[in-house]
Amino acid sequence: MNGEGNLNLHVRRGVVLTAVQQRGISSPTLLLFAAIVFMVRAVMLMLGPLLVALANDFGTSIAVSGQLAAATFVTLGITAPLVGPISDTYGRRPVLLIGVLLMALGVLGSGAAWSYGSLMATRLITGVGLAMLPPTIMAALADNLPPEKLGKAVGFIHSASWVGVALGVPAIALLGYIGGWRLPFYVTGGLSLALWVMLYLSLPSGQRRLGQSIDLINRFKVIGRQSASWYVLIANATQAAALVGLMTYFAAYMIESYGWDEARTAPGLAMLGIGAVIGSFVGGFIAGRARRLEWMAAISLTSGGVTGLFFVLDAHAWIVVAVAFAASVLVSVSVPVLTTLNMSLAGQSRGTAGGMFATSNQFGGVVGASAGGLMLSLGGYTAVGLLCLVAAVLSASVVGLVMRRAPEFRQGSSLDK
């Protein structure tokens, strides 16, 4: 992956769009996929800047409101591993259409929620829709692009998802400030419905392969037999817990500790999203290095310390935001590296491996949001910082002490050059 920088340069110049169009995926379709993953990321993390308003409206604590974010990750994690085999059997188009529709209906239903319980139910529905989209989009790209061109398109889509954090989540914070917590749900749900219409009109129908069965058990056995795959999943889940903990409780921490309102958190949330974009780029570079595991272990360990520092540092508000920005850069580096390792271990079962990887992401999200809320109720934001620190240290330990010594990763070192 020594050409990582060139790939990103080509994406910015639009070459990848032309290449995709020549292989049967038009530029509008690729941009539509990018808009969908942008919306997925924004919807996934949209509760962060709304936690205080939700707690006030439903008469609960911020810690209890944080469980609404965890609910999304629960159904997302359960659904994610099923998506790959199902889309392989029934086609990408129906899975994408159902996923976008469920996302839209879940978000609109959240805006109309009349109680904490009803909002919990609609967030569960939203999670099912979210789980169906990114893995299926990646599979659709792989169906139509050769390996040498697939990476460019995947890089473009992955970047778009983090723009959902840099721009989408701050926009949600501003909408919440302007019109209350329901307005962001209505706007986001309406945009999701518009995406569904465009997807329905533009995405060509596929054909199901007759006689092909889903065969979930055997597909999972292929991955489950490899201990190395479990190391990757554990490292990813623990690092994801630190990332989601930071993203979920950043706005609430700044509102409660520094007297900010939702509008003032928007620039800070944008900085966290930009930090994640930078971290992902750095991770893509490290993924192709011979000593990627050593680098990742050191960066993961540092990310835990910086994230923990954010929740305890007593300094000027924008100094604290700068620390959060640094934390978002560091905590995001591992995702491209672990994704690369996961795919290299999967052989011919990459769809199933991708679903399991997505599940590990969501499991980490549940820990970051739900356990973060529990820690908040027990020990305040200092305890949330401690949770993020412990999660990152666990991830670094798995990478540095276990994965570095595993023969499967040493055997793959030739791919790093």
Mark where each language-model region is.
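Helix-breaking motifs and short loop linkers at transmembrane-helix boundaries and internal kinks
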Residues: 59, 91, 112-118, 259, ...
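Helix-to-loop junctions at the C-terminal end of transmembrane segments
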Residues: 80-91, 279-291, 376
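Conserved MFS/SLC helix-loop-helix module at the cytosolic interface between two early adjacent transmembrane helices
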Residues: 78-114
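Juxtamembrane intracellular "pre-TM" segments in multi-pass secondary transporters
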Residues: 14-23, 203-233
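Cytoplasmic helix-loop-helix junction between adjacent transmembrane helices
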Residues: 122-163
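Cytoplasmic membrane-interface "Motif A"-like loop-to-helix N-cap segments
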Residues: 89-98, 288-300
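C-terminal transmembrane helical hairpin of 12-TM major facilitator-type secondary transporters
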Residues: 293-338
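Helix-loop-helix hairpin linking two adjacent transmembrane segments in secondary transporters
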Residues: 147, 155-203, 249
